C-alpha cells in the first residue's frame, strides 16, 4: 500500500508538470497517470513467491540443480518442455509471474484475467523481454506462454520494438515511476524494520536518514526533534521526510529525461540519477542493508527455511502430476 501511495504521488507530480509543459494534452489521459501508477504498484509484486527473492532463487535452483532437472526430459505421455519453457523455469521471475496471473485465463475464470487496462499491465513489466535474455540476473518480463499477450499490448500502446527474436521492447514510460516507488519504499522499509528489530541502533538509523539532507535541512530537523522527543516518532518523521525528498528527486529526473524515456534510450533507473547528496546516502543505505540486514542471522534463517519449504512443495506437487501421467500412459 505504501508503494502504491508513493507511486500515486510520483504519477500526480509528473502529470502536473507535463500538463504545464504540454498544455495541448489537457484532454488526454495524462491526469490519470497517478491512478495508473498506483494500480501498477499494487499489482507488480502479485507474482512473487513466498520468501520473496530467495523464493525465486529456490524455484530456479530446484529446476536447474535440484530434483526438478528431470522435467527437462521427455515425460511418460510423450510431452516435453520447449527450450524457452525450460528457460522460464530455471530463471523463475516474480514479475513475469505477476504478468501471467494478471492476464491468463485460468480454468473456470473469465477471459482477460484481472481485466486491467493495457497501460496498467505494461507499467508493471520492468523487463520487457523474454527469459532467453535474462542473463545472470534472471530478470525478464513475461513467460513464453504470455509472449503473445505482451506483444499485443506493446503493439497497441506503440512500445518500441528493439528485437524480434528473442522478443524485446523498450519500457513503457510509466515503468520508471513504478520502479522508483518500489526503490524508495523498500529501501526505507528495510531501514525502519532493521531499527524495530534492533539490528540497527537509534543513532545508526538517524545517521543513515539524516545523510540525505543538506546541512541547513539537518539543522531544521534537529530543532524539530527538540519538540518531538519521542525517538520512534523522530525516526518515522525522518523516514517520511526522506521519502518526500526522493519523490521530488525522481520526479525531476523523469522530467529532465522526458525525451530519452519516450524514445526508449534512457538507461538505468530514476533513483540512480538523483542529485549527488541523496544518491550517496541511498547507496550507503543499500550497502548497510546488504551487510547488516540481509545477512543477519534472523533473515538468513528465514531464507533457509523458505528454500527447504518451497523445494519440498515443488517436489510433492510435481510428483503428483508425473505419477498421474505415468498411470494414464500405462496400457490397460
Describe each PLM feature range.
Residues 2, 176, 180-183, 242, ...:
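Charged, amphipathic alpha-helical oligomerization/scaffolding segments
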Residues 13-18, 66, 254-257, 317-320:
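Solvent-exposed amphipathic alpha-helical surface segments
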Residues 169-176, 231-242, 270, 294-305:
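Non-transmembrane, amphipathic alpha-helical segments
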Residues 224-272:
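Long, amphipathic alpha-helical stalk/connector segments used for oligomerization, subunit docking
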Residues 326-332:
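Residue-level detector of conserved catalytic or cofactor/ligand-binding positions
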Amino acid at each position: 500500500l505504501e508503494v502504491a501511495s508513493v507511486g500515486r504521488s510520483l504519477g500526480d507530480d509528473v502529470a502536473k508538470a507535463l500538463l504545464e509543459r504540454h498544455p495541448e494534452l489537457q484532454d488526454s489521459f495524462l491526469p490519470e497517470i497517478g491512478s495508473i501508477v498506483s494500480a501498477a504498484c499494487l499489482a507488480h509484486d502479485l507474482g512473487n513467491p513466498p520468501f520473496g527473492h530467495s523464493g525465486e532463487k529456490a524455484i530456479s535452483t530446484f529446476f536447474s540443480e535440484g530434483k526438478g532437472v528431470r522435467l527437462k526430459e521427455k515425460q511418460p505421455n510423450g510431452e516435453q518442455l520447449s527450450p524457452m519453457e525450460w528457460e522460464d523455469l530455471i530463471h523463475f521471475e516474480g514479475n513475469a509471474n505477476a504478468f501471467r496471473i494478471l492476464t491468463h485465463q485460468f480454468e473456470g475464470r473469465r477471459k482477460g484475467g484481472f481485466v486491467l487496462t493495457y497501460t496498467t499491465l505494461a507499467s508493471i513489466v520492468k523487463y520487457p523481454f523474454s527469459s532467453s535474455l535474462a542473463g545472470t540476473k534472471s530478470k525478464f518480463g513475461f513467460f513464453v506462454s504470455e509472449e503473445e499477450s505482451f506483444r499485443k499490448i506493446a503493439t497497441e500502446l506503440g512500445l518500441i520494438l528493439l528485437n524480434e527474436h528473442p522478443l524485446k521492447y523498450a519500457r513503457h514510460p510509466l515503468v520508471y515511476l513504478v520502479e522508483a516507488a518500489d526503490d524508495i519504499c523498500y529501501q526505507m522499509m528495510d531501514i525502519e524494520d532493521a531499527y524495530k528489530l534492533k539490528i540497527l541502533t537509534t543513532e545508526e538509523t538517524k545517521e543513515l536518514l539524516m545523510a540525505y539532507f543538506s546541512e541547513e535541512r539537518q539543522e531544521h530537523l534537529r530543532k524539530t526533534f527538540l519538540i518531538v522527543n519521542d525517538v520512534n516518532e523522530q525516526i518515522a518523521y525522518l523516514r517520511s521526510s526522506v521519502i518526500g525528498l526522493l519523490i521530488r528527486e525522481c520526479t525531476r529526473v523523469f522530467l529532465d529525461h522526458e525525451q530519452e524515456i519516450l524514445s526508449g534510450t534512457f538507461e538505468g533507473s530514476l533513483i540512480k540519477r538523483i542529485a549527488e547528496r541523496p544518491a550517496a546516502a541511498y547507496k550507503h543505505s543499500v550497502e548497510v542493508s546488504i551487510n547488516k540486514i540481509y545477512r543477519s542471522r534472523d533473515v538468513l534463517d528465514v531464507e533457509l527455511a523458505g528454500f527447504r519449504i518451497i523445494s519440498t512443495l515443488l517436489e510433492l506437487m510435481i510428483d503428483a502430476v508425473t505419477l498421474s501421467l505415468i498411470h494414464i500412459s500405462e496400457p490397460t
